[in-house]
Amino acid sequence: LIMKINQILDKIDEHQLYVPAFQREYVWKRKHVKSLMSSLINEYPTGTILSWETSSPPELKGKSKYHETQGAVKLILDGQQRITSLYMILKGEIPPYYTEKEIIQDTRNLHVNVETLELEYYIKQKMGNNPLWVNLTDIFKKEIKAHQLVKDLQVKLGDDENIEDERIDLIHENFNKIESIKDRDFLEQSIPIKATIREAID
C-alpha cells in the first residue's frame, strides 16, 4: 500500500488512524527529526510504516476511545516516531494521542535556509536577522510564501543591490521542493483485519 504523508496525518485528525497504548513513548531527538526531514527534502527513502486494520483494537494511546460504530480502524505498529515527528513539523502541533507533558524533547521549531536547504534548530545569532532562515512549519502551513521572502530579502539588501534572477528561481524551487513533501508517498505494510493482536505484534 502507498499513502501520501498528508493522507496519513489527515487520518489521525479524522480518527481513522491511532497509536496503541502498548507503543513506546515518543523518544526521538532533534537530530533524528533533522535527519528525517533532510532525507525527505533530498527525496531519499524513509522506510515503511506497519499498520494493523482491526475492528476490535486494544487500548489506545492518549484520550482516544474506540466506538464500535467506527467499524475498522488502523493502528500504527511501526513507524510511530516518524509519523509523530512529521505531524509536529508539518502541523506545528502535538498529535492528539499525546499531551505536551509526554513529549520528552519538543522537536518542532526546525528551520531551513531556503537558499542552501541547510536544516538547523533555531539559533538567534545565526537566524534572527536573516530572512533566508524560515521555520519549516511556516512553509507547510503557508504562513510564508516564496515571493514574500524574496521581498523581505530585497528590503534587507537595500536599494543598492538587486537579487539575481537565478537566486529568486532557486528560492521558489526550494519552497516547492519543501511543500511537495506532504504529497510524498509513504510505503505502508498492512496486517490483515482478521489478525489477532498477538499475530499483529509478532
Feature names for model-found ranges:
Residues 4-30, 34-202:
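Basic- and aromatic-enriched surface patches that contact anionic nucleotides/nucleic acids
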